[in-house]
Swiss-Prot record:
Domain (MSP) ranges: 8-125
PANTHER family in the cross-refs: MAJOR SPERM PROTEIN, MSP DOMAIN-CONTAINING PROTEIN-RELATED
Protein name as catalogued: Major sperm protein 3
UniProt function note: Central component in molecular interactions underlying sperm crawling. Forms an extensive filament system that extends from sperm villipoda, along the leading edge of the pseudopod.
Organism of origin: Globodera rostochiensis (Golden nematode worm)
Modified residues (N-acetylalanine): 2
Length: 126
């Protein structure tokens, strides 16, 4: 039997993550991930700046119609001396092999199963 691709997810905000100046203190922005589909999914966040950008929780499991708020934090930095162009966070998700899975497993993303992703560019308002 062929594996079905993961259904869409929704993020709030839908397009980008925004951090406002000043950047001399840690700042946190919240993103809600919503699973409007009918299957349980596993999700994981990645970023192009792992030393500056942190996510909590960085991964998890969402049942059908469930949602979770993820805190995306930006550590203090100097935008005049550090390149921030192209910074983004990416959420990847896949169907869980076990419909009753409650705990995230990295192996879901390492096999030959279908993984979808959504990029959220980071905008720094200086």
């Amino acid at each position: 039997m062929a594996q079905l691709p993961p259904e869409d997810i929704a993020t709030m905000p839908a397009q980008k993550v925004v951090f406002n100046a000043p950047f001399d203190n840690k700042a946190t922005y919240y993103v809600r991930i919503i699973n409007p589909g009918t299957k349980r999914i596993g999700f994981a966040f990645k970023t192009t700046k792992p030393k500056r950008i942190n996510m909590n929780p960085p991964n998890g499991v969402l049942g059908p119609k469930e949602s979770v708020n993820v805190a995306i934090s930006c550590d203090a930095f100097d935008p005049s001396s550090e390149d921030s162009k192209g910074d983004r966070v990416t959420v990847e998700w896949c169907n869980t092999p076990d419909p009753a899975a409650a705990a995230f497993k990295l192996e879901w993303f390492q096999g030959d199963g279908m993984v979808r992703r959504k990029n959220l560019p980071i905008e720094y308002n200086v």
